[in-house]
Curated annotation (Swiss-Prot):
UniProt-annotated location(s): Cytoplasm
EC class: isomerase
GO biological process: protoporphyrinogen IX biosynthetic process
Pathway as given in its UniProt record: Porphyrin-containing compound metabolism; protoporphyrin-IX biosynthesis; 5-aminolevulinate from L-glutamyl-tRNA(Glu): step 2/2
Protein name (record): Glutamate-1-semialdehyde 2,1-aminomutase
Cofactor: pyridoxal 5'-phosphate
Subunit relationships: Homodimer.
Gene that produces this protein: hemL
Predominant localisation class: cytoplasm
Protein EC: 5.4.3.8
Family matches, as InterPro entries: 4pyrrol_synth_GluAld_NH2Trfase, Aminotrans_3, Aminotrans_3_PPA_site, PyrdxlP-dep_Trfase, PyrdxlP-dep_Trfase_major, PyrdxlP-dep_Trfase_small
Organism: Shewanella sp. (strain MR-7)
Transmembrane segments: none
């Protein structure tokens, strides 16, 4: 038994399922999860001391790589001044100014402690601002575990949402409508059914929780047009894509302007941080300047702000995003080339510093229903093969992969060589 396996058995005695977030349990791929001892650059090290080239990056935040010296030094310096004050700090102001400078649609921003808190607060604000109750989300998109967001589509296009988890009253879920990602007709159908009741659309601009699904041309701008037509707000959930797809997020990359934006992951530099911001007219509706209540004991925590600021400043380096995109393209297209070489059907998607691959004969994946038809058994086999080769991918066929600036030529080469060997073994076993 490895030390990771022993720790997992020990953890299950005191922690539900042995983990503090379900995907970490390896239920999507089988086997026992790795327990991580440390991380540095492009590598993570498990409790047994084995090194892995990491394409999870703490689920997105580690865009510069693990244990980046500038972030580490900023955190250590901040710790000397105290861990938490429960009062305003200059660091919060600097972070707000940095976010606003990088994302043109954000005129004011509120710091929180997680992505879930950011989306939950943005939706409450949208409902308060519009005085409407219903929200519109998309099948396969994930915006955190708030009650109104853990909702799946009903049996028909016009059916009200149904809870996707026990513990969520149907009275909550009925206010959440679910449309088809990359399908404007499904959105218009819902708006025409509830023309004066929808407070907002919330969307992942690149859906990263059904693997990696970019928007088709015109989709995001079409949502903007419909929101304007029906008086709803557009919330772009950039918790995953913010400062990862481009310096101004996915909204900058695709040229669409939301009313509100939610952020997380990258802005924390590895610390627990979320944020929501947007038009000043809307943001002034939040307490203490407006009637919509939102608060948080650790919001704007000085240690988290220090880490986030250090990372955000580093991301302003000229040419960084072009280099990151080139690395991502090489990995995604390299996986595809290896699969083609061995006659294993695969489709790929990638944008900025995130990518996805699908074991499928479908040439292009643009919707959730296509993702569910992919070969999960092939993914599981490939996953464990890569893990044995020292490459750590997301342990779910429904999660995106992430590159960092720490992934160099050697890491990319070793990863693609490993993929070639694993796919060759898979083909031989068919």
């Amino acid at each position: 038994m490895t030390r990771s396996e022993a720790l997992f058995e020990q953890a299950k005695k005191t922690i539900p399922g042995g983990v503090n977030s379900p995907v970490r349990a390896f239920n999507g791929v089988g086997g026992s999860p790795l327990f991580i001892e440390k991380a540095d650059g492009a590598y993570i090290y498990d409790a047994d001391g084995k090194a892995y080239i990491d394409y999870v990056g703490s689920w997105g935040p580690m865009i510069l790589g693990h244990n980046h010296p500038k972030i580490r030094e900023a955190v250590l310096a901040a710790v000397h001044n105290g861990l938490s004050f429960g009062a305003p700090t200059e660091l919060e102001v600097q972070m707000a100014e940095k976010v606003i400078a990088m994302v043109p649609s954000i005129e004011q921003v509120r710091m929180v402690s997680s992505g879930t808190e950011a989306t939950m607060s943005a939706i409450r604000l949208a409902r308060g601002f519009t005085n409407r109750d219903k929200i519109l989300k998309f099948e396969g998109c994930y915006h955190g575990h708030a009650d109104c967001l853990l909702v799946k589509a009903g049996s028909g296009a016009l059916t009200l949402g149904q809870p996707s988890s026990p513990g969520i009253p149907e009275d909550f879920a009925k206010h959440t409508l679910t449309a088809v990602y990359n399908d404007l007709d499904s959105v218009r159908t819902l708006f025409e059914q509830y023309p004066t009741e929808i407070a907002c659309i919330i969307i992942e601009p690149v859906a990263g929780n059904m693997n990696c699904i970019p928007p088709i041309p015109g989709f995001l701008k079409g949502l903007r047009t419909m929101c304007d037509e029906f008086g709803a707000l557009l919330i772009i959930d950039e918790v995953m894509t913010g400062f990862r797809v481009s310096r101004s997020g996915a909204q900058g990359h695709y040229g669409v302007t939301p009313d509100l934006t939610t952020l997380g992951k990258v802005i924390g530099g590895g610390m627990p941080v979320g944020a929501f911001g947007g038009r000043k007219e809307v943001m002034q509706f939040i307490a203490p300047t407006g009637p919509v209540y939102q608060a948080g004991t650790l919001s704007g925590n000085p240690i988290a702000m220090s880490a986030g600021l250090a990372q955000m400043e580093a991301l302003c380096e000229e040419g960084l995003y072009e280099a990151l995109s080139a690395k991502t393209k090489r990995i995604a297209e390299g996986f595809k080339a290896a699969a083609d070489k061995h006659g294993i059907p695969m489709a790929i998607n990638y944008v900025g510093g995130m990518f996805g691959f699908f074991f499928t004969e479908q040439e292009q994946i643009t919707r959730f229903d296509q993702v569910t038809k992919c070969n999960i058994e092939h993914f599981r086999t490939f996953y464990h093969g890569m893990l044995d080769e020292g490459v750590y991918l997301a342990p779910s066929a429904y999660e995106a992969g992430f590159l960092s600036m720490a992934h160099g030529e050697e890491e990319l080469r070793l990863t693609l060589e490993a993929a070639d060997r694993v796919l060759a073994r898979m083909k031989a076993a068919m």
